[in-house]
């Protein structure tokens, strides 16, 4: 497995590949000691993983929030560990997506949005991902009601994306609802399902690259070219799969480098 160069930068002096400033890439987590030594240097302590991660990548998708909202002190620690150009995206709590299944959860959504507001105030908030369970079939009326929740509609509302994991959602009716509310369709690629490459939000796009085997350099170059076209009009957030092996993190670094090369060509 290829290894990253092992500089000793600080979070205030990032070595992130110089991709266009509106393209954010990373993985769905950072706290993996097993990423040593191929991603993290052997001498970096676990307390400094995020700080080092932010020298190589410019975003992370926080899955912790699927089960529990972060405390103020926890979020403050994360924010202080990364530079100003870094973005945190957060997966919506399962109480919203899996237990309530988007129904009667106005208070839960308000709590979720409030919990990540410090990241927004610091200019380090990416997007909020609502990942629906695989057995949640298309219900446009439920989605329409959910998108009308005040915490998602007011002028300071965060960017949002939806990952649908049942084919029935992939319809013009769904896309029209997302466009109306400036919500992104998360273009997710897994070993079982590929979301149509449709971009509904005016301001942002969402990608999740979840193949267990990772991606070849040639595939990453192709994705970089297509993502650059999407990024001409909006911010792009792209996250590779996290595993005990650092394949996803290394893929994300190569993706940012590939975007930089495409931009320079």
Listing of model-derived features with the role each one plays in the protein:
Residues 1-265:
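Residues lining hydrophobic/aromatic ligand-binding pockets adjacent to catalytic sites
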């Amino acid at each position: 497995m290829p290894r990253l160069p092992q500089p000793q930068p600080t979070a205030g002096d990032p070595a992130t590949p110089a991709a266009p400033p509106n393209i954010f890439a990373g993985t769905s987590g950072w706290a993996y000691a097993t990423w040593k030594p191929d991603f993290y240097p052997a001498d970096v302590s676990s307390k400094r993983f995020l700080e080092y991660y932010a020298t190589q990548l410019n975003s992370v998708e926080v899955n912790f929030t699927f089960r529990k909202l972060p405390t103020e002190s926890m979020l403050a620690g994360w924010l202080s560990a990364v530079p100003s150009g870094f973005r945190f995206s957060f997966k919506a709590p399962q109480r919203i997506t899996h237990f309530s299944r988007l129904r009667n959860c106005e208070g839960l959504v308000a709590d979720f949005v409030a919990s990540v507001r410090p990241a927004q105030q610091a200019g380090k908030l990416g997007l909020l991902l609502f990942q629906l369970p695989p057995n949640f079939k298309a219900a446009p009326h439920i989605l329409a009601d959910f998108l009308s929740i005040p915490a998602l509609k007011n002028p300071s509302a965060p960017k949002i994306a939806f990952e649908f994991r049942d084919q029935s959602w992939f319809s013009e009716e769904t896309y029209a609802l997302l466009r109306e509310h400036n919500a992104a369709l998360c273009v997710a690629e897994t070993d079982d399902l590929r979301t149509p490459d449709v971009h509904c939000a005016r301001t942002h796009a969402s990608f999740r690259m979840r193949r267990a085997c990772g991606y070849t350099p040639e595939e990453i170059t192709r994705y970089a070219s297509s993502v650059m076209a999407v990024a001409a009009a909006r911010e792009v957030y792209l996250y590779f799969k996290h595993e005990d092996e650092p394949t996803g993190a290394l893929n994300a670094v190569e993706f940012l480098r590939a975007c930089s090369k495409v931009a320079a060509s």
